[in-house]
Amino acid sequence: MAKAKKPVKEEPFENQLWKAADKLRKNIDAAEYKHIVLGLIFLKYISDAFEELRSKLLAGEGEYEGADPEDKDEYKAENVFFVPEIARWSHLQNNAKLPTIGKTVDEAMDAIERDNPSLKNVLPKVYARGNLDPTNLGGLIDLIGNIAFGDAKSRSADILGHVFEYFLGEFALAEGKKGGQFYTPRSVVELLVEMLQPYKGRVFDPCCGSGGMFVQSEKFVEEHQGRVNDISIYGQESNQTTWRLAKMNLAIRGIDSSQVKWNNEGSFLNDAHKDLKADFVIANPPFNDSDWSGDLLRQDGRWKYGTPPTGNANYAWIQHFLYHLNPKGIAGFVLAKGSLTSKTSGEGNIRKELIEAGLVDCIVNLPAKLFLNTQIPACLWFMSRDKTNGGFRDRKGEILFIDARNEGHLINRRSKVLSEEDIQKIADTYHKWREVDGEYENIKGFCNSASLDRVRELDYVLTPGRYVGLPDEEDDFDFNERFTTLKDEFEEQLKEEERLNALILENLNKVKLV
């Protein structure tokens, strides 16, 4: 009797979509191709949302009785972008096989911007460029147009938003180091948001990249049965192409991005939200940034706890975040791990002042390999303007240290992610510690609530490992995973050695002896 075949696990549709889109990329650089693909996904989203409302207006039933389907105000009233005829997806799909399709898409983007001022200078107009083959562009339009998006709701916000987010992550992986400039790994964003719990109030990210922190904040509110309208977002980004991605990413989610600003001077030199006092600050600023114009800001009023060094912006970012917190506000952000110990150019003194002012609430040591753009070890800082209450227990004179270096799992030899269980474990530890009736306990090797006196004893060093100690079971690690990782790294080094030797030999052969 023949054995029954095991059912083949179907590949997630976003995976299939990515592979198909990647095949059409040909020789186009990932950094350029992302704007081509994401722009089309956005166009499909707004066209679908427009057509859905237009069909209701055409039917003219109930609340839509007597409505004019060509009246832009009808769409504006329902937070739907007006899409002129030449920009509707049906028009693009009908012209997808023509050699002029690139020009047609660019004209569609222009037309949408003209009719929707909030999208001015946001959409990519790159489709008529010579390096984009019209046949491949037509194939991409067919691919995106033929996705089975289900019912209206999932088609617009959920599915297309998910595809957009998934593609952002895949493009970040494809770009490697540069990808990290516009994308924070999803599991890191989820951890920050889960720990901060932004149920209600103003959420601010002064280096917002493609807007992932905002998207996750809105998801958090929805998942906890809150009202999305209870939070408002404020952001700033200095890279215009990244800002455009953020505006599209947020629009697909139906999130108001009117307060997400761009200027090329950046948050330090040209603060777009000078008077903002936020309930939550959530951010992933550039690690150890030496090019932040610190020499022009020596006397800046934000440096209440000490003037940051010109060669490293870490402590400038910390004080910028604090400046924008309201008296009950909480900040959570990613920094290079060196920020926990550095004493260079007065950084140790600033850290001491922050600790003595009772602002540092919790420090989390992150696992290696979470970030695409750097191998620099990273950590999370959580700072609170009011540790005496702020809706929680009085935590004055205490700091929680969490060492999460052993959490997470490898998805390939270079990248790790935190699972939902990892995120919940870390977030729950913080919540139990700060809540009035939280059942918090120190766990050797993982977490410790340290007194201010203990931090003073250790000279204001904030490395969690110094406080949590070693776990009782030191040999409890996955040998196979550790061995595989080391083997892969060794093989990479051998390949690099071979490449460099060949390069040296090639250059030596070019040298002509006189």
Each model region followed by its residue ranges:
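Non-catalytic, mostly N-terminal accessory regions of nucleic-acid modification and defense proteins
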Residues: 1-199, 261-272, 365-368, 386, ...
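Active-site lining segments that contact anionic ligands and/or coordinate catalytic metals
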Residues: 277-278, 300, 312-314, 328-332, ...
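Accessory, often C-terminal, charged low-complexity segments
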Residues: 287-309, 314, 352-356, 389-393, ...
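Conserved Class I SAM-dependent methyltransferase catalytic core
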Residues: 16, 23, 32-33, 37-45, ...
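Switch/connector loops and helix/strand junctions flanking conserved nucleotide-binding motifs
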Residues: 243, 269-272, 288-291, 341-344, ...
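Short, contiguous acidic/charged loop-to-helix segments that flank catalytic cores in large enzymes
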Residues: 27, 292-312, 338-347, 367-373, ...
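Conserved S-adenosyl-L-methionine
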Residues: 178-283, 288-292, 297-304, 315, ...
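Active-site proximal loops enriched in glycine and acidic residues that flank catalytic Cys/His/Asp
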Residues: 208, 237, 264, 285, ...
